[in-house]
Amino acid sequence: MNIGILAVDSNYPNLALMKISSYHKAIGDNVEWYNPLCSYDKVYIAKVFSFTPDYGYYINADQVEKGGTGYGIKKVLLPEIDRMIPDYDLYNVDKNLAYGFLTRGCPNRCKWCVVPAKEGNITPYMDIAEVSAGRKNVILMDNNVLASEYGLQQIEKIISMGVRVDFNQGLDARLVTDDIARLLAKVKWIKRIRFGCDTPGQIAECERATALIDKYGYCLLYTSPSPRDRTR
């Protein structure tokens, strides 16, 4: 089969599309980015946001399958696709970088967020060893990993494995206790720790969490040829 992939509203690596690509390549299909000058047996279209314009042109394919929050919250990947290692070549992702989730869902019910309606309460999803698949840098897109005991166990495993991570959706600063701060200070972060700050009322919580983590020795160290130029 000739498979086309179309991301409507984002250039950011789309995990679902990468897994779909892996699945079809594994069964011998040809997979490529959709080209309107070509014809396809099937085209997968992904849309992240409900407020962005849809693809408005004719799709030259026998079958068209649309997915993503931009089209609705009910459709999910088939289990045999969901557990595939993503096809990182689709986006020319660095060979040492992986993307994924450790948990899905969130216990909060923020009025602006679709996650609870789409994924429900927080549940275990994948192990960091599965997600990283031997890669040393991992972008984790969990919505509230600190709200899960499983998530905290996974952070401990991240530390023991020595992988570098970025929870790019932000951590919930309100959940940072003394013990969690000590744990987070041991993680090898890609550039920085991110905290979600969706309302002005959360600024104080972010400052409190930052101070706690700083207490346990988390710092950024810029190394230059001269020891005198090293700064925190």
Label every model-predicted segment.
Residues 64-88:
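Ser/Thr/Gly-rich flexible loops in soluble cytosolic domains mediating phosphotransfer, phosphorylation
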Residues 57-60, 114, 210-217:
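Surface-exposed amphipathic alpha-helices with a cationic face
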Residues 3-13, 86-120, 135-142:
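N-terminal pre-triad scaffold of radical SAM enzymes
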Residues 1-66, 71-73:
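A short, structured N-terminal alpha-helical element that caps or precedes a catalytic domain
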Residues 5-6, 44-48, 114-209, 220-224:
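Core AdoMet radical
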Residues 43, 55, 73-79, 111, ...:
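Short, charged, surface-exposed secondary-structure boundary motifs
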Residues 7-29, 109-113, 166-169, 194-200:
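Acidic/glycine-enriched edge-of-secondary-structure segments
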Residues 222-232:
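Single conserved hydrophobic/aromatic residue that forms the stacking wall/gate
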